[in-house]
């Protein structure tokens, strides 16, 4: 997780299209819009403002569609900006639907934090997924007094993130502080034992 205001431009790529045939004719969707109809949201790549805004908007839209049905958040992310990630986190906690989280590939840093923040009992990973937790990183430059101000702020952020992680994982704050002092990598089995996820899914139930 990084404590910075840096903007990362969206990496545009070719998005597959799917065609549905109905009595009224054919309708085409990009694959992510079609999956959104199934209440599936993808969080892939670095967490930054543009991506976070899209995910937040999708969650609010799905809540308006049906506040009783689960939302499924698929995560494959190396982490990213803390404030961007916290906008997703706060929305997950705010909306009425349960948010079931899935890790495919990796969930590192803010990705792991959001994975753990899913509804208890509905947090999953695939067998070869990798998780990583650590403390926030900062890279502020400026006058000495400003650096001191930002250093105090990042320590406050670190403590708050650790408190939330402890709540969702079910460990003490002291354990989380110790375990996130350096990069801590977890395999699927280790993530279950640690409490980051609730189960490993090797096939659809």
UniProtKB/Swiss-Prot annotation:
PROSITE patterns: CLP_PROTEASE_HIS, CLP_PROTEASE_SER
Catalytic activity: Hydrolysis of proteins to small peptides in the presence of ATP and magnesium. alpha-casein is the usual test substrate. In the absence of ATP, only oligopeptides shorter than five residues are hydrolyzed (such as succinyl-Leu-Tyr-|-NHMec, and Leu-Tyr-Leu-|-Tyr-Trp, in which cleavage of the -Tyr-|-Leu- and -Tyr-|-Trp bonds also occurs)
Chief subcellular location: cytoplasm
Active site, per annotation: 109 (nucleophile), 134
Stored CDD domains: S14_ClpP_2 (cd07017)
Task performed by this protein: Cleaves peptides in various proteins in a process that requires ATP hydrolysis. Has a chymotrypsin-like activity. Plays a major role in the degradation of misfolded proteins.
This protein's name: ATP-dependent Clp protease proteolytic subunit
Organism: Baumannia cicadellinicola subsp. Homalodisca coagulata
Originating gene: clpP
